[in-house]
Curated annotation (Swiss-Prot):
Assigned protein family: Belongs to the inositol monophosphatase superfamily.
Organism: Rhizobium leguminosarum bv. phaseoli
Organism ancestry: Bacteria, Pseudomonadati, Pseudomonadota, Alphaproteobacteria, Hyphomicrobiales
Signal peptide residues on this chain, from the entry's feature table: none
Keywords: Exopolysaccharide synthesis, Nodulation
GO BP of this protein: 3'-phosphoadenosine 5'-phosphosulfate metabolic process; phosphatidylinositol phosphate biosynthetic process; polysaccharide biosynthetic process; sulfate assimilation
Protein name: Uncharacterized protein in pss 5'region
InterPro entries in the record: CysQ/Inositol_MonoPase, Inositol_monophosphatase-like, Inositol_monophosphatase_CS
Superkingdom of the organism of origin: Bacteria
MF terms (GO), sorted A to Z: 3'(2'),5'-bisphosphate nucleotidase activity
Length: 95
């Protein structure tokens, strides 16, 4: 649904860190993630993206945070669904 609502025309199947790097480099526009990932899958790539001026937010628009604690087992390190983009674009609103 997100892809259709935002006129996404091409999808690339590569690892999370590479997706963040493509966003940071300006070679991709958006990285929506609606399935489970862990902090160690995304933290380094997200840091590169943010250093390049991009953003990663949860579906309610809150910046994605790392180092969460206080829940059971591996859930401490599970990411919520998120959307990342390069530059200062706003992508939570449909096109």
């Amino acid at each position: 649904s997100f892809l259709a609502d935002h006129a996404i025309f091409k999808c690339t199947n590569i690892g999370s860190s590479l997706k963040f790097c493509l966003l940071a480099e300006g070679k991709a526009d958006v990285y929506p993630r609606f399935t489970r990932t862990m902090e160690w899958d995304t933290a380094a790539g997200d840091a590169v993206l943010r250093a390049a001026g991009g953003s990663t937010v949860t579906l309610d628009g809150t910046p994605l945070t790392y180092g969460k604690t206080g829940t059971a087992a591996d859930f401490d390190f599970a990411n919520p669904n998120f959307i990342s983009w390069g530059g200062r674009k706003r992508v939570l609103e449909p096109a």
